[in-house]
Amino acid sequence: MAKTMTIDGNTAAAHVAYAFSDVAAIYPITPSSPMAEVADDWAANGRVNLFGQKVKIAEMQSEAGAAGAVHGSLKAGALTTTFTASQGLLLMIPNMYKIAGEQLPAVFHVSARALAYHALSIFGDHSDVMGRRQTGFAMLASASVQEVMDLALVTHLSAIKSSIPFVHFFDGFRTSHEVQKVELIDYEDMDKLLDRDAVKRFRDRALNPEHPHLAGSAQNPDIYFQGREAANKLYLDLPDIVQDYMDKVGELTGRKYNLYDYVGAPDAENIIVIMGSGADVVEETINHLNAKGAKLGLLKVRLYRPFPADRFVKAIPASVKKIAVLDRTKESGSLGEPLYQDVVNALVECGRADIKVVGGRYGLGSKEFTPSMAKAVYDNLDGEMKNHFTAVSYTHLRAHETRRHLV
């Protein structure tokens, strides 16, 4: 019988991260701080990881220092993780380029939080993780506390196997601090899935005076371009690795995951594409509406980087004619938010440009996102198909509650 425990999303992520880490370089920032706190507490009380050792917890002077420590620790052959959010993640970006470029299997667990624009907000959205999507880190999204537990495991296993670093993110406060009863994955079961040969290959690449090698060189125009393109195969192979581990975790737990999971009517014509905790709201909405005769669908995005267009389009029912893409971030001046642009591009590349796509923003700074708002998005697909709409402010859709609007 599976062991259950009542925990929050941060603790679920830390439980898995502790198992796979030799070192955790940390600096506290809301709402990610509890991950570092519980890891520090476990280390102080003698808890050991999958390698039979206590995790070395290194608290630095800032998130910039933590990212530098992660990079250096990885170069020394230690599996390393960190926990961060918002402005803290921004301070880590310079080192993230190096970590990805040098194919080091770091995992950053991020309680996704709003960035400080016109004002600071400690609450959740995807502004921080979208601000680092070009670094070369893979990105995997969890939508609930149980998913945080399961997909954190997929993340660490995939990073070690692929040599590609990951950002595993989940919505700040909404998921990071939500307390649920979840099925705990034991370290013994995690160990059965760990590729020990991949761990050895990683450790063998460590800087060592017994077999020195050059790292961090400066390259001229004759070779830099080729080196930059050399990692392409790793990213092309990564979706298969992630799906393979999703399947193995599914066999272990009985909870099945895919890179892109479709739920709803098999012959739906209108669907929403979304990632993070908002997917649960949309799923609740379509379950209610479909029970009354509607034919609506939802596509949950889990692997966001890399974004394999063929797998994404394959997950869409052939009957679909209209898609609304919901982003939990704002990219001022762009033709649309990041997920919207990726969806449009994927449909064009895979010959499904006949599908009409609109995009909208929701939930910035943990703004409320309700089933009535999700219904308004579906109604928009049946109506004027307003594009670049929001769930609040000057381009909003009208919700279907007499006393509650999207303003």
Language model: regions and residue ranges:
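Metallocofactor- and cofactor-centric catalytic cores in central/energy metabolism, strongly enriched
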Residues: 2-7, 23-30, 34-41, 54, ...
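Anionic-ligand anchoring segments at beta-strand to alpha-helix junctions in alpha/beta enzyme folds, i.e.
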Residues: 23-59, 273-299
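Short acidic, glycine/serine/threonine-rich loops at helix termini
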Residues: 35-40, 69-72, 92-96, 117-123, ...
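Thiamine diphosphate
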Residues: 37-131, 137-160, 247-392
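Conformationally flexible catalytic loops at phosphate/diphosphate-handling active centers
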Residues: 51-55, 166-261
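Conserved small/polar residues in nucleotide/adenosyl-binding loops
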Residues: 395-402
